[in-house]
Amino acid sequence: LLIPGVSAWARPHPKALYTHSVAEGVFRVFYTTEGKHAVPADDVDGNAVPDRVDDILVQLKAADWFYQTQLGLVPPLKHSRYTQSDGIEVHVQHFDQGTGLAFDEPTKPNWFEGQSSTAPTLKIKIGSQVDPRLSTTPAHELFHVYQYAYSPFKTKWFTEGMARWLEEPFS
């Protein structure tokens, strides 16, 4: 079902965990402002997006730029492994332990009313408690997506060691 004049990522399914979304470039951030998974509602710039979500996007875009222009890495969506994918979904939710996760396999996109694409997406999860002004979790998890595009090798000493090393530019 297409709803004219509504962003493809504007309205969540009534049973969805996330009640809001914002998209910039290849990133689509899904979040809620209510309940256990809520991000703080502060919106200093008045753009109708919580500052926490804005800050996650800023860090993701900066990391994406850094990985491509300073390290010469090919963006994940340009790798043959992920050519069928059309974006990177970032799900902001509560974590009892840890601060983030990145997934290596493309999956069905988060369903939103008015969505026109059924192409698989890559997924990152960021803890709603993570403050990207103080934490490098978004950049760290995005680097894992870059790693997975290059190699299926997922041994922790390799993936975590490299990702932690690359947190330095964002610290």
Residue ranges and their predicted role:
Residues G25-F158, M162-A163:
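Juxtacatalytic substrate-recognition/specificity segment
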